[in-house]
Amino acid sequence: MGKRLISQNRGRGTPKYRSPSHKRKGEVKYRSYDEMEKVGKVLGTVIDVLHDPGRSAPVAKVRFANGEERLVLIPEGISVGEQIECGISAEIKPGNVLPLGEIPEGIPVYNIETIPGDGGKLVRAGGCYAHVVAHDIGKTIVKLPSGYAKVLNPACRATIGVVAGGGRKEKPFVKAGKKHHSLSAKAVAWPKVRGVAMNAVDHPYGGGRHQHLGKPSSVSRNTSPGRKVGHIASRRTGRK
């Protein structure tokens, strides 16, 4: 009897395939959307900048005027001791948080909410930013890094600027060990071995005197889990 496929082991949910979220610094999101932000602004001071394992951007610990502390994504150019503003009357300056409806067109933004008050869901990776493209009655159009223009509620909040940590991909890993330690902070099994390079006991495409599939690559949607590899329920394969 053959061994279980990687996809089957992943479904079991062993520690190897689970994200080590216990190593993270904490929840990174905006403060609650209260009346102070809806009618004015709240001041906060950056008291520390932290490395968060598994995240591509640094996070800052911010202490607000009411004593509340939050972990937030910081933009390029912000350092310890600087002040940020959150609210409808905040200044248009990197690091400040405003509703999309109050941000002028063409300004780069990140950590965008999809529902007002959800804490920020879009554009959170290091070096990323979106652009406010247009405003209309009851909606704001934002161009995401993918090029997709998304229509959002003008009350959704966003941060002015570009997420810190850009250019991280320009430096090569050089050593396999560095890559291993980097991906061990995420739910990524690395290195990724091809099925044809495995033994017959490990994968349906494994074994043989040379690397080849040895069977059709298309499989049914209802195929048993141990054989469900390749093109699953494909309408067509190969070049068009």
Swiss-Prot record:
PROSITE patterns xrefs: RIBOSOMAL_L2 (PS00467)
Superkingdom to which the source organism belongs: Archaea
Keyword flag Acyltransferase: no
MF terms in GO: rRNA binding; structural constituent of ribosome
Biased composition (Polar residues): 1-11
Keyword Membrane: no
Compositional bias annotation for Basic residues: 13-26, 228-240
Sorted UniProt keywords: Ribonucleoprotein, Ribosomal protein, RNA-binding, rRNA-binding
HAMAP family xrefs: Ribosomal_uL2_A
Annotated protein name in UniProt: Large ribosomal subunit protein uL2
Species this protein is from: Methanococcus vannielii (strain ATCC 35089 / DSM 1224 / JCM 13029 / OCM 148 / SB)
Gene that produces this protein: rpl2
